[in-house]
């Protein structure tokens, strides 16, 4: 192949004809696991620095960016619940873990002179602003990165669902789910070498086939509000900007997409 990387454009996504950005307001969902890199637990400062640089590139392109960050690199409520902990208590601990990640990312961004605000669904005024929808939108309009912490503030809801909820609330045009995989497959590619990777999917197909994109509540929220979802590998440098330009860097789920 001569080492040539061939990028194609996704047919069901609007592409800016002048090569500019296809979206102006984006909700980026970062999994907690993405922040720990190759570590088994916690936060890898080098990975966080790389993510911050990508976010800076997005901001410099004039795109408004809000972020929902998970907490699975520190604590997973579902696993703790399965081990016997009260589910609501476990979920609240997980929400606190997301705030730790949000503050870490905020620090990395501010060291690059990127104005950033952390808004949390659980009040902790000493370290973050409370989540108020109008305030979040105003921060975005002023060119600040907005990081949402503490999930939705309610147990039994995932941070994926929070991402869909916040995207609808702030009128984001798309949800980017940045993970450690390069898209959505019909089976686990780690165990099935013949697993098929999808380029585009419909919400209905994702729900009917129970594909592991986001949880069903998040998918339904995006479907009801016609918010497309892009799933891509955060580990590939430049993928966030490429996704905003409409390049096929992963799997796109949308109302007008075909299963391909």
UniProtKB/Swiss-Prot annotation:
Residues 37-42 are annotated as: Involved in allosteric activation by GTP. UMP binds at residues 71, 91, 152-159. One of its GO terms (biological process) is UDP biosynthetic process. GO terms for molecular function: ATP binding; UMP kinase activity. This is Uridylate kinase. Belongs to the UMP kinase family. It is found in: Cytoplasm. Catalyzes the reversible phosphorylation of UMP to UDP. Keywords: Allosteric enzyme, ATP-binding, Cytoplasm, Kinase, Nucleotide-binding, Pyrimidine biosynthesis, Transferase. Pathway: Pyrimidine metabolism; CTP biosynthesis via de novo pathway; UDP from UMP (UMPK route): step 1/1. Gene3D superfamilies: Acetylglutamate kinase-like (3.40.1160.10). It comes from the Bacteria. Pfam families: AA_kinase. It catalyses: UMP + ATP = UDP + ADP. GO terms for cellular component: cytoplasm. The lineage of its organism: Bacteria, Bacillati, Cyanobacteriota, Cyanophyceae, Synechococcales. The gene is pyrH. Allosterically activated by GTP. Inhibited by UTP. Homohexamer. It is an enzyme of class 2 (transferase).
């Amino acid at each position: 192949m001569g080492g040539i990387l061939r990028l194609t454009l996704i047919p069901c996504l609007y592409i800016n004809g002048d090569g500019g950005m296809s979206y102006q307001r984006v909700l980026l969902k970062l999994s907690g696991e993405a922040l720990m890199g190759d570590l088994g637990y916690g936060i890898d400062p080098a990975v966080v620095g790389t993510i911050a640089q990508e976010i800076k590139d997005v901001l410099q392109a004039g795109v408004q960016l809000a972020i929902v960050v998970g907490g699975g690199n520190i604590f997973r409520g579902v696993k703790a619940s399965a081990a016997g902990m009260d589910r609501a208590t476990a979920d609240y601990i997980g929400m606190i873990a997301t705030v730790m990640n949000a503050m870490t990312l905020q620090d990395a961004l501010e060291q690059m002179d990127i104005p950033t605000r952390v808004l949390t669904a659980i009040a902790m005024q000493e370290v973050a602003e409370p989540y108020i929808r109008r305030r979040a939108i105003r921060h975005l309009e002023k060119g600040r990165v907005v990081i949402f912490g503490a999930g939705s503030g309610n147990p039994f809801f995932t941070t994926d669902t929070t991402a869909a909820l916040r995207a609808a609330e702030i009128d984001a045009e798309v949800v980017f789910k940045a993970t450690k995989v390069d898209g959505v497959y019909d089976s686990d590619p780690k165990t099935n070498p013949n697993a098929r990777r999808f380029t585009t999917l419909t919400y209905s197909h994702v729900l009917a086939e129970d594909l592991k994109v986001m949880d069903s509540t998040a998918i339904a929220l995006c479907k009801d509000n016609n918010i497309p979802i892009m799933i891509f590998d955060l580990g590939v440098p430049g993928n966030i900007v490429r996704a905003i330009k409409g390049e096929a860097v992963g799997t796109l789920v949308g109302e007008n997409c075909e299963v391909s």
